[in-house]
Amino acid sequence: STKAYSTQLAVIYMIVLYMAEQLHNISEQELQAYIEELQRLPEFVAACLTDKETIQYFASKYFNAKDMYFIGRNVDYAASLEASLKLKEISYIHSEAYTAGELKHGPISLIEDGTLVIAICTYDKLFDKMMSNVKEVKARGAVVLGITTQQKKEAVSQEADYSFCVPKISDFMLPSLSIIPLQLFA
């Protein structure tokens, strides 16, 4: 369920922060900033829901799709896995999640004209590589929905057919937000 997934992520974040503190891998100031961000997650989730019409439009347009693929890198790949599972469970649509860096090793051959690909592009460090993957699937005829942060919206909008923005928070916490529009979509 959505609540279980979100709760699991929050607990993982707390464990990671605790371990980082215990191992002295994080300053007190950084720790407090992460804790404040974690406490504000409900506010950030609410911000994701203000533009749910975009996702509802996309869902209504492609509700009878036969196949759908989710791609992402690093933490975005983890969100892709959860989104694919949700789509299968709720909509009974065949979907798969792939790490975008592995597309050339087989999965790209599944993409044909009109195939739906949801690209989660929130992780800053691998953003340029992710955009390269979006171009690859577009070249094969995919229809792409890009999930990104407001800071990257323009770049994603230039490549994807549709885009949806989530608030920018720490990279490792972004799956808590990028999953929201995808759960609405499912």
Model-derived regions, located:
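A SIS-like phosphosugar-recognition module
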Residues: S1-A186
